[in-house]
């Protein structure tokens, strides 16, 4: 479909929808059953920084059908991570339903629910609260000031919060004059549905610190959350999650990053790593390592816990690597020895195309990485001279280099994980910094690291 002036089409459609809904479900049939909201949307956004409003929607005008997830499935995942949950209720363009709200709310019992729709009539607010929404979205792009005030007043009378959405400087000025308590900056152009996160940069700095600011649309990576963390109080994230096959995996990638727990030797440690948010789990097949794991143990772990596993090898015969790939589902091979370009090229020819190759580069003060990068690899892992040493290298060596395909390793722990994340690498590789002893991971240390990454601050208790 042509996206030009899609907003005008949606509003025209909404007027007709309201007329029809009023006939089949008149206000008089349910108004007496409406109760006041008992979940505090504003407080939920203040509890953890950054706040995360995770969205349930099945369809998007710009992307089409996103998924076939049912609301129960999504609620069970979102309740573990969300400050609040947004539910799209527009039927024609987003395949939403008001009936989704109580389903999600009854499972996610701690989170307030944001009803996200194109509100133009008081009837819709009554309907949203009847279905147990705790807050609504009011878009200044489709409302005049007097309409906004009337709808806001009604929402407040039902103890509901209002997220005021703006798209440009003119709407921001209106929101400020209207004393909006929560302002959502939509990074999507509502006329053609293009996205630019620079909209948040341009507008957020002009808003009072006493106002809660939410960045909406186009948020799809942990690095974006990290970059915007001092500009806004939270994020509304929808399509970047709902378009992925593995929803919980997608949530982890956005809220804590592409992180790896290496040196796994036990099923319980792999399960813990996945539950806390690790995207990758590492098996060290180097026999000289204190964290060496044999094939039998690795096979048992992969059968019991499904995640993206990385096999770490040191100067190993390619035939041995191929044999192990046949036995366990490895996402990538990490080369941690003295493998040269010829070795890498030969390896790539022998292993399945779906298996990536990562190459570790050892750094010290005398050797900069620019002269030691390899071709034909998917990622580089920057580490200390000796992996698993528990000592970080001098991160100053990374200055002025593109780190988007670099995984940072070497002595990462609770004390330096936030500084490490601020470097902007693709991901972080944790090993000795979260251990009780070599190969045995510490639950508390692991939890605190991922909680710190989630909240973008060091948490030691």
Curated annotation (Swiss-Prot):
In the N-terminal section; belongs to the TrpC family. Bifunctional enzyme that catalyzes two sequential steps of tryptophan biosynthetic pathway. The first reaction is catalyzed by the isomerase, coded by the TrpF domain; the second reaction is catalyzed by the synthase, coded by the TrpC domain. InterPro entries: Aldolase_TIM (IPR013785), Indole-3-glycerol_P_synth (IPR045186), Indole-3-glycerol_P_synth_dom (IPR013798), Indole-3-GlycerolPSynthase_CS (IPR001468), PRAI_dom (IPR001240), RibuloseP-bd_barrel (IPR011060). Its EC number is 4.1.1.48, 5.3.1.24. Pathway: Amino-acid biosynthesis; L-tryptophan biosynthesis; L-tryptophan from chorismate: step 3/5; Amino-acid biosynthesis; L-tryptophan biosynthesis; L-tryptophan from chorismate: step 4/5. This is Tryptophan biosynthesis protein TrpCF. The gene is trpC. The keyword Glycoprotein does not apply. It comes from Buchnera aphidicola subsp. Schlechtendalia chinensis. Pfam families: IGPS, PRAI. PANTHER family: INDOLE-3-GLYCEROL-PHOSPHATE SYNTHASE, TRYPTOPHAN BIOSYNTHESIS PROTEIN. One of its GO terms (biological process) is L-tryptophan biosynthetic process. PROSITE patterns: IGPS. Keywords: Amino-acid biosynthesis, Aromatic amino acid biosynthesis, Decarboxylase, Isomerase, Lyase, Multifunctional enzyme, Tryptophan biosynthesis. Residues 1-258 are annotated as: Indole-3-glycerol phosphate synthase. It catalyses: N-(5-phospho-beta-D-ribosyl)anthranilate = 1-(2-carboxyphenylamino)-1-deoxy-D-ribulose 5-phosphate; 1-(2-carboxyphenylamino)-1-deoxy-D-ribulose 5-phosphate + H(+) = (1S,2R)-1-C-(indol-3-yl)glycerol 3-phosphate + CO2 + H2O. Residues 259-461 are annotated as: N-(5'-phosphoribosyl)anthranilate isomerase.
